[in-house]
Amino acid sequence: MSQRDFYEILGIAKNTDVKQIKKAYKRLAMKHHPDRVKDNKELAEKKFKEIQKAYAILSDTQKRQAYDQFGHAGINGNAGATSGTSFSSSGFGDIFGDIFGGGSQQSNNRGSDLRYDLEIDLKEAAQGTTVKIRIPKNETCDTCSGTGAKPGTSVKTCLTCGGAGQIQIQQGFFAVQRPCNACSGTGQRIESTCNNCHGKGVVHKQKTLSVKIPAGVDTGNRIRLSGEGEAGIRGGLSGDLYVQIHVKKHAIFERQDSDLYCEVPIDFATAVLGGQVEVPTLDNKLNIKVPAGTQTGKLFRLRSKGITHLQHGGSGDVICKVKLETPINLSKKQQDLLQKFSNSCGKKHHPESNSFFGKMKSFFE
């Protein structure tokens, strides 16, 4: 059964940024939320779930990339994605906190996500590697264990919001919740602040992490390290670290998906008579047999010598394109010998030239 395009469901273009995707989702969620639709709630619930699913995919960079490349198959397990993707309304707490009020205190205290740009070479991208990175980030304060309070003192519940971290404001027919100004949304009041973190609950540090790079990554891929972002405020969850991959340009190979292309020069004699030619791979050098009469542009394929497929294992190929190198700086003797050789050749030695000039002659007649 055919499935609707996610971009069509949200009414957005394929190049829409994340901010506009969220905006479109909010607008549609307000319109089709079952609690706001009086008639045909069953249809409204179906429509709302469809909108939820579209937003869950398009708001996630990795899922969106898989969907853009493979369509619905990319997020249904056919292209290496996890099979049976589930969609729960609990994943939309931040947005519904904005629309209908609410949102957990723990969510408000969550640490920020971080990004680290990592440059690797083509061989590391092809075969996978593990690298160590050093990042500056906020870590939970060891002195106060993240409470922000001076050791030996206690953290008090905010009297304004009763520890909820939010206050409710009536706006017309709607009751809207907003972060409490008295405690900055934490639900707590500190009487004596920690001398180490000055009441923040976090301190700035440098942290070294080992990042496993899977074989087959390419520029634009990113790796998520859960909980390795900024520390949460006063018991809040830590954010995530996103490692953005950049693959350096190679001196010999040009990458196309999982295949590697290179151009291999061969001399005139080898092209005419045939012979062995040494060609590169990412690991070593190999010899290929060039048959007599090889023309420039002929492709030779070295199977499974390319890049590991990121999604389903196996490897691509190395494809060598031979290029006939015309000799230069010839001596007078060499030129004479070459001219004699040319004079000795007949039409049967140059079938493509004869065919071309024959067609050209008939064209002008």
From Swiss-Prot:
Names of the cofactor(s): Zn(2+)
Pfam families tied to this protein: DnaJ, DnaJ_C, DnaJ_CXXCXGXG
Binding residues for Zn(2+) 1: C141, C144, C194, C197
Record-linked SUPFAM superfamilies: Chaperone J-domain, DnaJ/Hsp40 cysteine-rich domain, HSP40/DnaJ peptide-binding domain
Domains: entry comment: The J domain is necessary and sufficient to stimulate DnaK ATPase activity. Zinc center 1 plays an important role in the autonomous, DnaK-independent chaperone activity of DnaJ. Zinc center 2 is essential for interaction with DnaK and for DnaJ activity.
Gene Ontology biological-process entries: chaperone cofactor-dependent protein refolding; DNA replication; protein refolding; response to heat
Recorded family membership: Belongs to the DnaJ family.
Gene Ontology terms: cellular component: cytoplasm
Zinc finger (CR-type) stretch: 128-206
Record keywords, A-Z: Chaperone, Cytoplasm, DNA replication, Metal-binding, Repeat, Stress response, Zinc, Zinc-finger
SMART domains referenced in this protein's UniProt entry, alphabetically: DnaJ
GO MF annotation terms: ATP binding; heat shock protein binding; unfolded protein binding; zinc ion binding
Residues in J domain copies: 5-71
Assembly: Homodimer.
Cited InterPro entries: DnaJ, DnaJ_C, DnaJ_domain, DnaJ_domain_CS, HSP40/DnaJ_pept-bd, HSP_DnaJ_Cys-rich_dom, HSP_DnaJ_Cys-rich_dom_sf, J_dom_sf
Entry binding sites for Zn(2+) 2: C158, C161, C180, C183
Main subcellular location of this protein, as a coarse class: cytoplasm
Function: Participates actively in the response to hyperosmotic and heat shock by preventing the aggregation of stress-denatured proteins and by disaggregating proteins, also in an autonomous, DnaK-independent fashion. Unfolded proteins bind initially to DnaJ; upon interaction with the DnaJ-bound protein, DnaK hydrolyzes its bound ATP, resulting in the formation of a stable complex. GrpE releases ADP from DnaK; ATP binding to DnaK triggers the release of the substrate protein, thus completing the reaction cycle.
Protein name, per record: Chaperone protein DnaJ
Highest taxon of the lineage: Bacteria
Entry keyword annotation includes Transferase: no
Swiss-Prot/TrEMBL CXXCXGXG motif repeat ranges: 141-148, 158-165, 180-187, 194-201
